[in-house]
Amino acid sequence: MRLARTTACVLGLLGASSLSIVVFAGPAIGKASHAGWPSINGHLKMHKTDRSGTIRGSSRSDELLGGHGNDVILGGTASDVIWGDYKPCCQPTHQHDVLLGGNGRDFIYASHGYNHIEAGAGNDVVHGHFGHGKIDCGSGHDVVDVSHRSRHRYKIRHCERIR
């Protein structure tokens, strides 16, 4: 994947002890690494701290990555890849994430905590192997991948296929 530029952006300073940083990298050109994912031709946006915050997608296909805090991640109008928590270790179960796919064929991955997921329009794929909460697939022909262990922890609506 080739990145044109990388910029660190301070989203908010709410007093001396609260700072949220999101890294914007892009526009990216290329194919993301997982089979079936859209070509990421928008931005890579991620929470680099464990603070709570909001990430908004663009009109292009973006990869939007939340951290260990309480994240609100809003997909844009194209096909996006959304992660409730991208960090591979120390997965907290106390976080509360809101993951909204928007239009397009979105790929959404739940965090280990509480997840409120609305996939939106498009033929979306939602992965709820971890955590608990609500998954509403919205319109389109959607697929939810959820482990047998986690299935009873989610209230699942409007999903054409659960596997």
Q: What does each of the following model-derived ranges do?
A:
Residues G42, K48, G57, G66, ...:
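Glycine-centered beta-turn/loop sites at beta-strand termini
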Residues T7, K87-P88, I135, R157:
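Secreted/extracellular small peptides and ectodomain modules produced from precursors
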Residues D50-S52, L99, I117, I135, ...:
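All-beta strand scaffolds that present successive hydrophobic residues in beta-strands
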Residues R2-P27:
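Secretory targeting and sorting signals
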Residues H129-R163:
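Leucine-rich solenoid repeat scaffolds
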Residues G26-I82:
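N-terminal segments that cap or nucleate solenoid repeat domains
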Residues V10, C90-Q91, G138, E160:
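Secreted/luminal cysteine- and crosslink-motif detector
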